[in-house]
Amino acid sequence: PPENIKKIAKIAKKYDLIVIADEIYADLIYENHEHLSIGSLENMKERTLTLNGFSKTYAMTGWRIGYIAGPQDIVTKMTEVRHALSINSCTFSQYGALAALEGPQEAVQKMKEEYDLRRKFCMKALDDIGFTYGDPGGAFYIYTNVTNSGLTASHFCKNLLQKTGVLLFPGTLFGDTEDKYIRLSYLQPIDKIEESMNRIKRFLKL
């Protein structure tokens, strides 16, 4: 939430910290949620490295192109390291990224609307199952608490895959130290999501 971003900025300025902000999902925000770029706040531009790319907003996963904005002295040093490793992004990816930025943006909005439909479908299905989750205000993932299944998240995912063929990832891969959460993605078409949810429901009744 913007209020938390402002608190982080206040701490960064107080203790003279550099902030690294991954804003890859900045354009995939839903309903009453709001994205605030920390580098846009007062006196934060000179202490913020903002990372972004094209894989999420423009569905260009595999083109392997992104960008960084930040203080010139830091970015210059980062560029030197980058040149020692891989020189530059391939030419067609650069042209593709330019076309994405300069071209019509209607497709981005349509994609976002479709993600939102899938998001709401998943939320309704999880409510029906009885799983709790954090409000997914952006991106295309839902972090879901599965403790009322009687299993740890790791065992839940393993058993679900073995018995139903549905692949989910436990939150332990993303910082969940209590093994209570799974990460559910709604990138797939709605019919596949519906089938997966039905399989999860049947799995819980076994």
Task: Report the location of each language-model feature.
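PLP-dependent class I/II
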Residues: P1-L206
